[in-house]
Amino acid sequence: MIEGKLRLTTVEGAGRQFVAQSGTGHALVLDDADGHSGAKPIELALLALGGCTAFDVINILRKKRQKVTGYEIELHADQNSEPPAFFTRVEIKHRLHGQIDPEAVRAAIHLSETKYCSVGAMISKTAKIETTFEILPEGIRETLPNAA
C-alpha cells in the first residue's frame, strides 16, 4: 500500500502551497499555477514518468552489464486544451553515455514501457508516448514506436 499526507500552508496574498509527505517520510512542495514556490502537480506527474522509466532502464542496463557513464531523460508533454488538462502526448528522450549496445537500450526501454513502469501504464491511457534514445559520444539515435 502507498501512503501519503498533504498539508496546506497559506500565506496572506502569497498564493497556496502544499507540503506533501510520502509514506516513506520524504517531503516536497507543491504550488498552483500562480505560485512559484513549488512544482505544479501536473509537473510532478511528468517527472514521475521520467523517474519511473529511468530507474527501469538503468537497472536493466546494469543487469545486462552495460557500461553506462551518464544518463539523462528529457520529457515534453502536450495537454488537453479543456479541463481536465490531462496529457495527450508525451515525448521522452533518453540520452545515455558510455559503451552501450543500442539493442540493450532498445530492450530496456521496451521492458519499461510494456512491463515495469506503472506511471507510464497510467499516463498511456490518455497520452501517446513517443520515445527516442541516443548514445553519446557515438551519436546513435533511434526513434522507437509506441509500445502500447
Positions of predicted regions on the chain:
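Extended beta-strand/beta-hairpin segments
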Residues: 1-47, 58-148
